[in-house]
Amino acid sequence: TELFFKKLAGYDTLRLILCEKAILVEGDSDELIVQRAYYDHYGRLPIEDEIDVISVGTSFLRFLEIAERLEKPVSVVTDTDWSLDALEKKYQAYIGENKKDNINICYDSEMDEGDHEINGKAFNYNTLEPKLLKANNRTTLNNIFGTNHQSDNDLHTYMKGNKTDCALKIFNAEESINYPEYVKKSFE
């Protein structure tokens, strides 16, 4: 872990060390959605409460090692992806009987399935975008995106191909949306 962080640019590591609390997310779209969900809940952005939302890619565990040593309050917002068992194994040092007081792993334990395919590959219903559609509806998201998708599967395809644009439109939207429970759990 020390070698990893020595090679890292350092800014996100410094952000984790200096913040009062952190919410770790995988990418830009997750960061925008968490920021907006927090804003819709509290009427202000997380940074105004000294909570830094940090995009860490797939390096969650390395950041959690630092948070654990510093006893830094941290939530992780992560996709379940294809396997709940694999996710729970990955975070076994931080959940269940191993849960740390300062670390909160937030994910949807309900596995969704469907028959949608994109370019001949099965669609993953257990990422943020399909969970956003599930928490809302096609009409709401079509209105925010300025689209007119006639089926949930068409909207799934659009959202998967335009993750950051969709998240940015949600972030900037005048109206609020519903958020998956695991996203809200990261800051409530």
Q: Which stretches of residues belong to each language-model region?
A:
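Acidic, Mg2+-coordinating catalytic modules of nucleic-acid enzymes
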Residues: K6-L24, D28-E188
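Conserved beta-strand-loop-alpha-helix hinge in the C-terminal portion
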Residues: T1-E2
